[in-house]
Amino acid sequence: MRALFLLAALLISLAAPARAADDVAAAQGVIRSQVEAFSRDDAAAAYSHAAPAIQEIFPQADIFMSMVRNSYAPVYRHKSFDFGEARVADSTIVQRVHIVDAEGIPWEALYTLELQPDGSVKITGCVLLKAGQPV
């Protein structure tokens, strides 16, 4: 019985990092898909990755895209977009992204994403800072 308990504890401890890695991979896939939609000017696809709370603030895909173009130009159009450090806490994923905008200026984006009740991952926010600027 004790051996069974130890085996169960070991399996649980090994599953947590694997789940976190799966969550990060899913989050990166969502971010990548949204950025690709921005590059195609596909408002519907980009909007589909926004969490319900974001969709409440921006009730139509074209309104959402206008906000991104005006407030998140380095995310909307860039020379490079590379994933950095990620953290997982409960159902929230925080993903750092290193961006070089169309003019060659480096930026850091801090994305937050949440696991949804249906199992999908949606973007709940993005903070954009010039590289080296304190958070």
At which residue positions do the language-model features occur?
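Short, histidine-centered active-site or binding-site loop motifs used for metal coordination
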Residues: 12, 50, 127
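Generic anion/oxyanion-binding catalytic loop in active/binding sites
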Residues: 9, 35, 53
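Exposed beta-sheet edge and beta->alpha loop/turn motif
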Residues: 85-135
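Short solvent-exposed beta->alpha transition segments
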Residues: 25-29, 43-92
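Bacterial N-terminal signal peptides
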Residues: 5-15
